[in-house]
Amino acid sequence: MKHNYGILSAMLLAFLFFSSCRSNMNPALADREVRELLGDVPGFDWELDQVSRLKDPKDTLYPTVPFDDPDSRKITERIQKNSAYRDGNKSIELVGQDWQKSLPLDENGVVQLNLENAMHLAMLHSSQFQRQKEDLYLSALDVTYERFRLDPNPFAGVSAQADKEITDNEIDLQSRAQLGFQGVAGQGATWVASLANRLTLELSNGDLEVGGSLANLTITQPLLRGASKRIFKERLTQAERTLLSNARSLEQFRQGFFLDVVTGNNPAEGVRGAGIPRVPFYSSSVSGYLGLIQEVQRIRNQEANVAKLKDSLVQLEAAFEAGRIGNRLQVDQARQALFNGQSGLLAAKSSFENRLDGYKLFLGLPPDLPVQVKDQYIEDFRLTDPVLVSIQDQLNQLLQQIRDPKASVVLSDLEEFGQQVLGMKDLLRESLSGLMLDLGLFTDQLPERKKWFQRLRERSDLKELGMGENAFREIELEKLAFDLNQTSLRMEAELKVQLEILTKMVEGLSSVPIEKAKRELASQVNELSGLLLELSLTRASARLESVSTGDVSVDAKQAQQTASELRLDWMNARASLVDSWRMTDLARDDLRTDLDVVLSGDLGSDSIGSGHFKSSEGRLRVGIELDTPLSKVRERNRYQASLIGYQQSRRQYLSFVDSVLLSFRQHARLSKLYQLNFELSRAAVRGAIAQVDLARLRLNEPPQPGKNSQFGATTARDLVNALNDLLEASNSFLSVWIGYEAMRMRLTYDLGTMRLSENGIWEDPGPVLSVVPLP
C-alpha cells in the first residue's frame, strides 16, 4: 500500500493556520477595528478612565462573579447541582478604586463644584454618558462584521468516525478533512473554493490509507433577484449609514448632555435611535447646575433679607423704647416677619441640600459626598455684599447686648464693644472700594444699555402696549448713574465722619456714666448700622444696573433654514427617510424571479495518487436554477408593509420639519418676552430698593419741633413689606436671567451651531442670531 503524507501534512498545516486566524478574533482586535472606524469622533472613548467610579476593579476579559442573592443562589444550585458556577463573596468591589483621585477637593476634603468641574465629573462618572459611547461602539461592531462577511472567508472542518463489523476484528478510523474559501464578488455572485481529502487508519494493525482528494470551485451568479451590488452589499451599506447616524447622535447627545448638566434638560435622544428623531419642545424650567446656583443665590438673598429684618427690628425696638412708636403691634409685626424669614431660610437650605444630593447622583457621585457649589457664574447677581451682611449681623448682636436690661454690662464691656466696631473699619473701606468698582462697571455698560433701550422702544409689540417713546429712555440711565455717583460720594463722607465720632466716643467712655455711655454707644452703633444698610442698598443698585446679557435675535424661517443645514438630527432624519425608501427597493427585489447560473468545477485524484490531481479526474458543470414567484405571498406582504412604512416615515419627516419651525417660533416669542421681563424685573428691583431706602429714611427721621414725634401706624409694616418686595424682586430678576441664559444655550443647540470645547464646555458665541454663515 502506498502511503502519501504530503497532502495530509498540507491540510493539517492549513487547518492549524485557519484555527490560529480564528483565535486572533479577540476583543483587542475588535477594539482596534473600532478605533480605525471612529478615531475622529469627538468625545468618543468607550474605555473608562482609571479614575472613573464606573471602572471595574477586576478589569479582566471574564468578569468576576458578584455576590448573589441567597435565595436566588439556592434556585441555581437546586437546578444545576454540582455544575453551578461558584458564588462570589461579599468582599468583591464593584466600584472603581481610584475614583476619588478625580475629585477637585479643597484643603478640607470638600468637592469644589463649579461649571467646569461639574462637566468634568459627569463625563467621568455618568453611566448615562458611558452608555451612549458603548452603544456607538456596538454600532461600529456591526460594520466590522458586515465587512468581514463580504471579504473572502476561510473555512475548515474535520470529521472522524470509528467503524467495526461484528464478525470482523478490524477497527477502521475514517477521517475527512475539508478547507477552503468562500466569498461574494461582482454583481452578487457567490463563490466557494474548497479542498477535501479522506484518511483511513486501521487501528488493529496500524495501516494508514490516504484516500482520494477533491478540489472544487462553485460560482453562483444571480440574473434577476439579488443580481446587483446594491442588493448584496445592502447590509454593509445600512450598517455604515447607521454608524454615521449614530456618530452624529453621539455628538448631539454630547451637546444635549452639556445642557442636561447645566440646565437639567437634555433634548437629544442619543445613540441607536430608530426612525425619524423627535423634536422635544423647549421647557422654561431650569434645574441642573444653573438651578443649583440659583438656589444658592436665593439663599444669599434670604440671608440678606433676614439680616435687614433683624436690623429693622432693632431700630423699631429702639424707637418703641424712645416713645416714637406708640403701639407695640408694629414691633411684633416686624418680629413675626423676622421669624417667617428665618423659617423660609431654613426651608430654602433644606430644599437646596435635597436638590444637591439628586445632582450628585446625576453626576455619578455618591449622595453623601461633601460638595460646595461655587457660583462665579452668577457673580454679578450678588446684589448684596456678604461682607456688609456679616457686619450688620455683628452690629445687631452688639446692639442687643448693649440694650439688654438683664445683661450686666460694665464699662470695660462697652469699651470692648466699641473696639469691635472700630475693628470693622478696613472691611467698611473695602466695601466702599467695591462700590466704586461696581459704579465703574455700570458706567462701562451705559453705551450698550442705551442701545438696548433703543431696541426695546422700537419693538412693535411694546408700542401696542403703550410702552413706546416714554419707556426705556436713555436719560433715565444717565440720571441713575449720576445719582449713584453722588450717593457714593456722600456715603463715603458720612461714613468717615461717623467712624471719627465713634472713635472719639469710645476713647472717652471712661469719663461718662455707664447708662449714658450705653445710650450713646447704642445710638452711634445704630446710626452706623443705618449707614451700612444704605451702603448695602447703594451697592445693590450699582450692581443691578451693571448686569447684562447676550443678545438673541430669532426669525423662525431663517432659523429653520440654518438648522436644515447644520442640525445633526436633521441630517439623520433625511438619511432615515431614504433608508425607509431603500427598504421598499429591497422588498421589491424580493418579488423578482430567482434565476441563477451555477458554474461548478472539480479536479480530483484517485486513492492511490492522493494529492496528485489529474485532468482525467476533473469535471465541469454548468446549470440554471429557476424559482418562479408563484407563492411569494410573504414577500408581497413585506413589500406592501415597506410601502406603508415609507409613507409613515415621510409623514414623520414632515412633522419633524414642522416641529423644528414650531420650536423656533417659540424661541422667537420667548426671547422677546425674556428681554422685556429682564428690564422690567430690573426696574422692579430698583423700585424695591427705593422703597426700602424710603422706609429706612422714615424710620431715621428726627422728630419735628411742635409735631407728634411718633411714627405712623404703618411704618413697621411698610418697612417689612419693602424688604420682602426686595427679596421677591431680586429672586425674580435672577430667575429671568437664568431662564434667558438657558434659552440662549438651547437655541444654539436647536440651530445646530452649538460648539463644545474638548472638556465639553459650551463656547459662548455672544449674540445668538438665526442667520449663521454656513461653513
Give, region by region, the residue ranges found by the protein language model.
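Small/polar, glycine/serine/threonine/aspartate-rich low-complexity segments that form flexible
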Residues: 101-111, 158-221, 376-392, 457-468, ...
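Hydrophobic, small-residue-rich alpha-helical packing segments that form membrane-like cores
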Residues: 140, 154-157, 161, 173-179, ...
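Amphipathic alpha-helical coiled-coil segments
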Residues: 132, 136-143, 239-242, 253, ...
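Acidic, low-complexity, intrinsically disordered peripheral segments
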Residues: 22-24, 28-69, 354-524, 542, ...
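A glycine-/polar-enriched beta->alpha junction
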Residues: 124-130, 137-152, 167, 180-209, ...
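Structural signature of outer-membrane beta-barrel domains
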Residues: 153, 161-165, 198-200, 253, ...
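Regulatory alphaC helix of protein kinase catalytic domains
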Residues: 58-121, 125, 551-556
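C-terminal motif of bacterial Sec signal peptides marking the signal peptidase cleavage site
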Residues: 17-20
